[in-house]
Every structure is written in structure tokens, then in C-alpha cells.
A protein has these predicted regions:
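Non-catalytic, soluble scaffold/interaction modules
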Residues: 1-170
């Protein structure tokens, strides 16, 4: 499976984990066979996006970029078309085949010409490191009240007190 994440604006908010992006899963064998291969989509909340500042804002603040809220209408639709997703997946297959291993690929869609561009590719580390290790499965024995929702960053079940971190200095 090729796993693709996408959000609006510059990719830094996705990389930093500051935004919950859209997620797309593309089936490699179906894609290689020339068939429609998008097998699952998850709509992310995409609350914010990072954008370039105007020349006036740059002159006033000295900043090249800023973070702004994404309008509700945009949040409620996918940030990529199915055709874009499958094109990115085809690029991923070519890159993976060239390097002979799974790759973590950063891409961008130009806001002016609408074209997809590959920005960088590096060996994928998280999933490939897991190969050969025993897989542990966890099962919840019950369900409690949902206090907060977000994007999972791990695959285990945790318990204990919640600590809210307001800044990097904490």
C-alpha cells in the first residue's frame, strides 16, 4: 500500500504534526495493473495551513510565512483529487523501485500551475525497522467517555494521567 497524507498550504504543518491531514491508501498491485487503486480515504480536520505572507506583511513583520485558519468549506472536502492521489502513488512506485526499498517522499502541489512535484525522498524508517520483529496486538477491554480526539502517533494502548503541554519550554 502507498500511504499519502495531504493538507492545504505549505507542508511544514503536516511534518510538525500541527495539523490532522487527509489520508489516502492506494493498493500497489491494482495501480501497477493500471486499475483504479484508491482503496481508502480519511478526511482530516485540516484546521490550519501555513501560507506565504504578502510583500507588505513581510516588510512589516520580517516573516516569510504565517499560519492561518482553513475555511470550514475547505476543511470539509479532501485536499487532493483521486487523480492527484493516484499520480503521487505512481511517482512513489517509480522512486521505490529505483531505490529498491520503501521511501518517505515529500511532495507539493504548486498553487499557481496545479502541478505535483516531488521535493525529496529518503529511506522510510518506521515501518521497515518493524520488519522481522514480533508483532504485539492490544485489545481494549472496555470503552470510556471520549475526552479528546486526534491523530494516533503510535500503535499501543496507554493509560495514566493526561498532561497538557502548552509550549516547547514545558
Amino acid at each position: 500500500v502507498v500511504f499519502i497524507t495531504a493538507s492545504y498550504g505549505l507542508g511544514e504543518t503536516v511534518v510538525q504534526g500541527a495539523v490532522n491531514p487527509d489520508e489516502f491508501y492506494v493498493h500497489k498491485p491494482m495501480l501497477r495493473a493500471g486499475n483504479r487503486a484508491l482503496i481508502r480515504r480519511n478526511l482530516g480536520s485540516k484546521l490550519i495551513e501555513m501560507v506565504f505572507t504578502s510583500p507588505q506583511e513581510k516588510a512589516e513583520t520580517g516573516k516569510l510565512v504565517k499560519t492561518v485558519e482553513v475555511p470550514t468549506e475547505q476543511r470539509n472536502r479532501f485536499s487532493l483529487t483521486d487523480a492527484d492521489v493516484e499520480q503521487l502513488a505512481r511517482y512513489a512506485l517509480v522512486i521505490e523501485e529505483h531505490y529498491g526499498r520503501p521511501m518517505d517522499i515529500e511532495w507539493g502541489k504548486d498553487g499557481v500551475d496545479g502541478q505535483l512535484y516531488i521535493l525529496q525522498a529518503r529511506p522510510e524508517t518506521v515501518k521497515s525497522q518493524a520488519q522481522g520483529k514480533a508483532e504485539l496486538r492490544y485489545k481494549l477491554k472496555g470503552r470510556g467517555t471520549v475526552l479528546a480526539e486526534g491523530r494516533a502517533i503510535g500503535q499501543k494502548i496507554g493509560t495514566g494521567p493526561v498532561r497538557r503541554v502548552h509550549s516547547l519550554s514545558e
